[in-house]
Structures are given as structure tokens and as C-alpha cells.
Amino acid sequence: MLSKKFKQVMETDTIATAKALLGMQLCLDGKPLGRIVETEAYLGSKDSACHSANDRRTPKNEAMYLAAGHWYVYQIYGHQMLNLVTKPQNVAEAVLIRALETADGHLLANGPGKLTKFAGIDKSYNGDSL
């Protein structure tokens, strides 16, 4: 469950959200997966590395335009990438969850593609709400 304070941070500051996620436990479907140890912020239309750079809106990145607290999952080079959408609806910014520290020190979560494979995350999570 997310606190009201964290939800407010998500809606106002993507970089602060990326920092605040560090050390948090990532749970999917009620199952704890590990502690978030690496994130990367994508700052929307002004960020040339972001899928919504220059206000580019496509069916593939549509989940980025949902309200803060939704997942944006996309595939690149055969790997799924897990992003947490930030900002209010129609303002496309997100934080990529890059790595987890698992309870057993599992090394298969030490990169964004390895993390999603370890967690069993696929495109079906795209657009889902926390």
C-alpha cells in the first residue's frame, strides 16, 4: 500500500520518486520480490531518451499517459522493462525499475531485463495500477 505522501511525490517529481523508490520492497501480486536498488527517471517530452519525448504518443507508450501509480511495461531486445508511471494523467513521465536485491541474493534481478524475467513480469502488467 502506498502512502498518501508518496503518491503526492509521484504526481509532482519524477526524480524524487526515483530516489524514494530506492530501498522500497517491490511486491507483485502480493508476493515480495526484493528491495529496489537501482532506478532511472524518464522526464517526458523534454527527455530525448523517454518514449514520450517531444510529446510522442503512440499505442505502444499509451500506458505512460495514465495517472501516477500505473505500470508501463514495454519490450526491448526481447526483454520486458518495468516502469512506474509518475505525474497526473496525460503527463507522460516514469521511473524504470532497474535492479532488485533479493532476500537470497539472487543475481538474476541485477538488471532491468533480468528483473522482469526473475519476477515473471510480462506485457500483461502494462497499464495495471499498483
Language-model segments: residues:
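Conserved, well-structured core segments that form or line functional sites
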Residues: M1-L130
